[in-house]
């Protein structure tokens, strides 16, 4: 079973790879990614789409913006993982 820590670690890796100019690797898990983390909204959607695929989740559109920090992102992915 996937843990929140695994999702946060992978999210950091994906952001560092996909958004090298924007992502701040020192952002804390509870800080907003769209301001302190340096990620813009298009970059955020790109990262979330990658994580959805990797963790077998389907995040409804109305929940995407709940994932404002790494902590919240992990929670949203875990809540929406497909069972089985």
Show where each model-derived region lies:
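Phosphopantetheinylated carrier protein domains
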Residues: 44-66
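Short, structural beta-strand-to-alpha-helix junction motif
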Residues: 33, 69-70
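C-terminal structural segments of small proteins and small subunits
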Residues: 65, 71-79
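N-terminal helix-turn-helix DNA-binding core of bacterial DNA-binding proteins
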Residues: 30-37
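Thiotemplate assembly-line natural product biosynthesis machinery
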Residues: 1-24, 78-84
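Catalytic nucleophile serine of serine hydrolases
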Residues: 41
């Amino acid at each position: 079973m996937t843990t929140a820590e695994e999702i946060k670690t992978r999210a950091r890796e994906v952001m560092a790879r996909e958004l090298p100019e924007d992502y701040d690797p020192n952002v804390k898990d509870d800080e907003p990614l769209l301001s302190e983390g340096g990620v813009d909204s298009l970059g955020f959607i790109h990262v979330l789409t990658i994580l959805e695929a990797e963790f077998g989740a389907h995040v409804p559109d109305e929940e995407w913006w709940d994932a404002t920090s790494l902590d919240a992102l992990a929670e949203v992915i875990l809540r929406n993982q497909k069972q089985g």
